[in-house]
């Protein structure tokens, strides 16, 4: 064994050793030893140091086990945040001759985990009595992993991990189009939750439509993420929107038309706005289109205030059979849908032309000029002429357009 390997092995072996160890005249670190400065507690299996109890730092589920100061078991993880357990050598024994494995290891580790869980629970009960509610719920991840969420049942503050806010237009695929939900920035009190209202939604937007999400977004409701104990007080406040009948009615609907893109084919209903009813509550939306879902009307409602193609992000994820996002198809369908909306909502042909024309800021030669544009029966330019038309110009430009 090379000197470097010897040194690294010794450093690992002496971390929990009960007496100082010198190697090459250097004192080796014993940070996991009983006299290494950590705060240990006595238990039925030995002494335990609980890591991560001073301030929240994740679930804290990894641990190292020592017997007579030597490492004898470690849970599988690369994290350095670990609980330390020194087993009572009168009750537990190592297998000879190497003494690097426990006798009846599986049974011993099962008991170690049980006692570790009990010790963590006892510590949290003590902390609950001394910490503020906001500080205590900061340990949510660790409480959840150790199945101790019941300790939050009577705490008048909800951890942000249990709630979501709708911050953007709801879409059917958040991996492709981005998240429209996020955690609140801080824990929320009972009063804050009651003021805003909290709901649960169990809809797949592509299948069930975006109606309930748009309703909740319009009302600025909080979304319950369903992660607290069944006995938590928040369950008495959560309004389950899927338990209520969803009705969407248009306001001053003008007409319907069929959109035929490369990916999306769908009936589109044009209107001034639409109302979303859930129970006796209603919201009216005039600036966000809504897809009603494949299991419902399977159509799109476009109010007057939305001239975008964002609603296609509710209808389709534009993923191929190989789960790859088809960006070019998405962009072409989006451009086509915008033109489709303009064609169906423009007040007159000139208004439609103005809304459909691109930006010519990169062509200084066109600045201040006027043109006569003729479209063919498919809506494509048949001829473009400078205005006023000069003699012979029509034939020249028309020939150019056809070449």
Enumerate the predicted regions with their spans.
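Short, conserved catalytic or adaptor-binding loops enriched in Gly and charged residues
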Residues: 13
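Phosphate/anion-contacting hairpin/loop surfaces
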Residues: 10
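GHKL/Histidine-kinase-like ATPase module
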Residues: 4-7, 16-120, 152-194, 203-204, ...
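Hydrophobic alpha-helical interaction segments
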Residues: 112-154
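Charge-rich (often acidic), low-complexity intrinsically disordered regions concentrated
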Residues: 41, 144-403
